[in-house]
Structures are given as C-alpha cells and as structure tokens.
Curated annotation (Swiss-Prot):
CC per GO annotation: plasma membrane
Subcellular location: Cell inner membrane
Protein name, per record: Cytochrome c-type biogenesis protein CcmE
A single BP term in Gene Ontology: cytochrome complex assembly
Domain of life: Bacteria
Disulfide bonds: none
Listed Pfam families: CcmE
Gene: ccmE
NCBIfam families attached to this UniProt entry: PRK13254.1-1, PRK13254.1-3, PRK13254.1-5
Residue intervals on the Periplasmic side: 30-153
Naturally occurring in which organism (per UniProt): Methylococcus capsulatus (strain ATCC 33009 / NCIMB 11132 / Bath)
Ligand binding (heme): 124, 128
Role played: Heme chaperone required for the biogenesis of c-type cytochromes. Transiently binds heme delivered by CcmC and transfers the heme to apo-cytochromes in a process facilitated by CcmF and CcmH.
Primary location group: membrane
Membrane topology: Single-pass type II membrane protein
Length: 153
C-alpha cells in the first residue's frame, strides 16, 4: 500500500508526463505545418528543402508564362533578379497575376528543379511588395536602390 505522499508524487509524475507528451505532439504538428519563405536565389542554391512544402516569392519573368491548351496547367518562371525558378501550377490563377507582377507561390520543389505550386497568390496593391521579396530583389540587382514605392504605405 502506498502512503499519501507516494500517491501524490505518482499523480504529479503522471501529470507532468501527460503535459510533456501533449506539448511534444503539439509542437511536432506545428513544425510540420510551418511554411517557410525562400527567394528564387535561395532555391537555386539548394537552401530550400526538397520534399517539403514552402513559399517562394518574386516577380513573374516576362514572356515566361505558357499555358497548356485545353488545360488549367500553367508554366512560368519567378525571379528575384539573377536567378529564376520554373513553376508549374494547375488551377485558376488570381485575376491580378501577370508577367512582371510580384507573386508568392506555395508548393514544393521536385527532383527536376521545378517548383510544383499548389497555390499562387498575387499582390493586391500595386505599391506593395512583401519585404522579403523587395530585399532579395534589391540585393540581387532586380530592384532599384530606392524601392520605397514598393513598401506598404
């Protein structure tokens, strides 16, 4: 038979173990659902994870949009200046999607180096560009040094 103190210690130990297990599962689920942002230069250099979804952002390269006939499949390239990553997307593109436009795509990179997008988001305000995209474009020479017109007002 256990003394009251031993019973309390057993309950405390079980509660600590239960809370620890719940925290572990919550953090594991949270980690698997995170979508990190990468620039085309980071993807080209191999920094982006293969086999895991992430976000890529940049400008749609002019004359790179190719639509497959009788299909919703679209191929285009997204660039941050010196590097461009081919993107394949099947679905309806946003109304604001066009060449030279800033976009963010969600998906994963395949073995051939093509980004398989599951979602494409176009910027809504013509004067706004996500800070990560603007910094990458500025750093890589794809954006003028004074890019204040791209910042959210």
């Amino acid at each position: 038979m256990m003394t009251p103190r031993q019973r309390r210690m057993t309950w405390v130990a079980l509660m600590v173990a239960g809370v620890s297990l719940a925290a572990f599962f919550a953090l594991t689920a949270f980690q698997k659902n995170l979508l990190y942002f990468y620039t085309p230069s980071q993807v080209a250099s191999g920094e982006a994870p293969k086999g895991y979804p992430f976000r890529i952002g940049g400008l749609v390269v002019k004359d790179s949009v190719k639509r497959e006939p009788d299909s919703l499949t679209v191929r285009f390239e997204v660039s941050d200046g010196p590097n461009a990553v081919p993107v394949l997307y099947t679905g309806i593109l946003p109304d604001l999607f066009r060449e030279g436009q800033g976009i963010i795509a969600v998906g994963q990179i395949d073995d051939g180096g093509t980004f398989q997008a599951t979602e494409v988001l176009a910027k809504h305000d013509e004067n706004y560009m996500p800070p990560e995209v603007a910094e990458s474009l500025k750093k890589n020479g794809g954006l003028p040094a004074d890019y204040s017109e791209y910042r959210k007002k």
